[in-house]
Amino acid sequence: MNMDIGKALSDVGGLRDITSRANNSLPPTPDSSPAAPSKKHKLYDFLESRGKIETPRKRIVFEKKPLLHKPVHIQKKPAQLCKELLIRQLGGSRSHPFSTKTSRHVGGRLNLETYYSRPSECLMMLNQLPFCLGFANNESLLAVCTETGALELFDSRFYDRQNEENQPSARRIHGWLAHNNAIFSVNFSKDDSLLATSSGDQTSKVFDLSTQQCITRLGRRGVDGYHSHSVKQVNFCNDSPYNLVSCSRDGSIIFWDMRTHGITIDGEHFQKPVLRIRKAHENSGRDCSITSATWLPQSTSQVISSCSANSALKLWDLRTVHTVRPLPAATTPELTTSKRDFGVTNVCTSPDGERIYAASRDSIIYEYSSRHLNSGFCKTYKDPRLRISSFYVKLACSPDGATLACGGGVQDKTSGVVVFDTTRNCSSSAMLTGGHTKDVTAVDWSSEGQLASISDDGSVRVWNSSLHGSAANLREKNFSEIFYWGFSEK
């Protein structure tokens, strides 16, 4: 059986739908997580109680199969267990244990010119384009989703016994068909036990990573009260595995709580919304697409959102929002740097939540203070090679908050990622070149300081930083010697 599965996965880009309709039903609820007794949808589940955040406890139940080894006595994190379960099922090697140790070289504390990527850290998605990606919060587990609705898991630090250089490489672990339409975002819960996806089928799904089964759906196609267009983004609350927020092309933002009662139709479980904000970014009486809705770190009640019509960012506080006519707690003023409005493609925050970064269609990244949104932006990041030409271009902040990465880099006929140093007063930047041949769209950072990027050429690339001059040595070689390598340059 392991040989058959291994053969199936050896076909590059080949996917197999392992989530049949029968397996997508909601599993029995564990005794430690009973359903809420009240059928009313209340907002206090999102709020902070007495200034102290109480993280709900959740018992992770893993699928038991005869092929699995008996559990070890050392307690491991959910993501590590999930990865090992998947590799054991596929007959993979466990010669190098997965480590959660933080890299010594993280983010912008290194010179921006030290990033590089080897050929073994590039994977190709054949016959389908990667649309989004996301790293797990505690491990080197990378999820990549495509235009066909496929979801694939990669290990960005896989060690091979036969590799004489003993260098980690990127390896495909597992994959399944998550949606029958394009997937626009993917996000891990804080403990990495759950995975949420948003799709063009007007719904989002939440998967149990240990079984790869869909445990609930956020939305119902064609039903009032839910999203009526493509769901552009879905995100878990950092301090609660039950609370999520999603935004859609229809201009609405919906808050979800998986502890509330849902409905089951034909064996499929659908969650009911807790709060829906219609026309969240209404512009001149017309609806506009909500491009991003992100929780502020260390908060269970505040969400920052952006739209496609203008550069305005809005802060929503669930402690003060009203269901009849919701009003934002704060809004950024109109930009005066250009003669016309430019939409925002994506928003991210610094790890401490003090800074907010917005990637604008005018190819400028704006930095705001989360405490003073009404005062406008406090800093801009510019680079002549940065061209944010579509709403698929995303940005991400490193785990230490010192480096900002954004897709859309173009130099001559080469595409790449543009990185900025956020610790300096002046804008210091570099471009990661040589890794992709077509437009680079989404990027994300791992907890260990690795950077992943995807491109319209179908490639998934992992970047590392080094103090040993790896990138500098590559820049000194000719093109034939660095074919399929990527490196950073000023």
UniProtKB/Swiss-Prot annotation:
GO terms for MF: protein-containing complex binding; protein-macromolecule adaptor activity
Q: Where in the cell is it found?
A: Nucleus
- List cellular component terms (GO): Cul4-RING E3 ubiquitin ligase complex; nucleus
Q: Which PANTHER family does the UniProt record give?
A: DENTICLELESS PROTEIN HOMOLOG (PTHR22852:SF0), LETHAL 2 DENTICLELESS PROTEIN RETINOIC ACID-REGULATED NUCLEAR MATRIX-ASSOCIATED PROTEIN (PTHR22852)
**Which portions of the sequence form the region Disordered?**
18-40
Quote any Pfam family the record assigns.
WD40
Q: Is Cell division one of the keywords UniProt gives this record?
A: yes
What name goes with this protein?
Answer: Cell division cycle protein cdt2
What are the UniProt keywords, alphabetically? Cell cycle, Cell division, Meiosis, Mitosis, Nucleus, Repeat, Ubl conjugation pathway, WD repeat
InterPro entries on file:
G-protein_beta_WD-40_rep, WD-repeat_CDT2_adapter, WD40/YVTN_repeat-like_dom_sf, WD40_repeat_CS, WD40_repeat_dom_sf, WD40_rpt
Q: Where are the WD repeats?
A: 178-208, 226-257, 285-317, 339-369, 387-419, 435-464
The family note in this entry says: Belongs to the WD repeat cdt2 family.
- The residue ranges crossing the membrane are none
The pathway it acts in is: Protein modification; protein ubiquitination
Q: What is its main location?
A: nucleus
